[in-house]
């Protein structure tokens, strides 16, 4: 069964009429930059696939959270930010920090090699998680 996706303009109009400002939700991903460089030299497509796997897994695992449900209801307004981690150690340290702070996330492990490649958070309001991500820059 397919769910009808309502145009974002209709939803925004309804919110404007009710005086409710829509909450902006962002899904953050942190992808290992070193995988694109020697000695790994993974192709761009392989890195994009890792980010896609992590994002999909995080959305699925946290599908019952109200933020995830709201994010998925507004397909035309989805926001993702892809940041870069220098290496595996940096990525795993971030995963540990997120775990300690109870920030819902998925650490994607490429199989069968068991290589940590990407972290995806479930959708969050930016202000709730920016303090944990501010040291990471946009992936280039």
From Swiss-Prot:
Stated EC number for the protein is 3.1.1.29
Task: Give yes or no: UniProt keyword Amino-acid biosynthesis.
Answer: no
Q: Which GO terms describe its molecular function?
A: peptidyl-tRNA hydrolase activity
Q: Which reaction is catalysed here? A: an N-acyl-L-alpha-aminoacyl-tRNA + H2O = an N-acyl-L-amino acid + a tRNA + H(+)
EC primary class: hydrolase
- The domain of life for this entry's organism is Eukaryota
Q: Which Pfam families match?
A: PTH2
Is the Ion transport keyword given for this protein?
no
- Record keywords, A-Z: Hydrolase
By sequence similarity, the record places it as follows: Belongs to the PTH2 family. PTRHD1 subfamily.
**Role of this protein:** As a putative peptidyl-tRNA hydrolase, it might be involved in releasing tRNAs from the ribosome during protein synthesis. Some evidence, however, suggests that it lacks peptidyl-tRNA hydrolase activity.
State the protein's name.
Putative peptidyl-tRNA hydrolase PTRHD1
Name the species this protein comes from. Answer: Mus musculus (Mouse)
- Organism phylogeny: Eukaryota, Metazoa, Chordata, Craniata, Vertebrata
């Amino acid at each position: 069964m397919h769910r009808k996706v309502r145009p974002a303009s209709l939803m925004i109009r309804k919110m404007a009429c009710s005086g409710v400002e829509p909450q902006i939700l962002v899904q953050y991903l942190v992808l290992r930059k070193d995988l694109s460089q020697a000695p790994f030299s993974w192709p761009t497509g392989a890195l994009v696939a890792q980010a896609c796997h992590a994002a999909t897994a995080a959305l699925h695992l946290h599908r019952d959270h109200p933020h995830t449900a709201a994010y998925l209801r507004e397909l035309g307004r989805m926001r993702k930010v892809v940041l870069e981690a220098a290496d595996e150690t940096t990525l795993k340290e971030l995963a540990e920090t997120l775990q300690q702070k109870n920030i819902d996330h998925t650490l994607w492990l490429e199989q069968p090699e068991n290589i940590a490649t990407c972290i995806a958070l479930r959708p969050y309001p930016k202000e709730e998680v920016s303090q944990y991500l501010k040291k990471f820059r946009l992936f280039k």
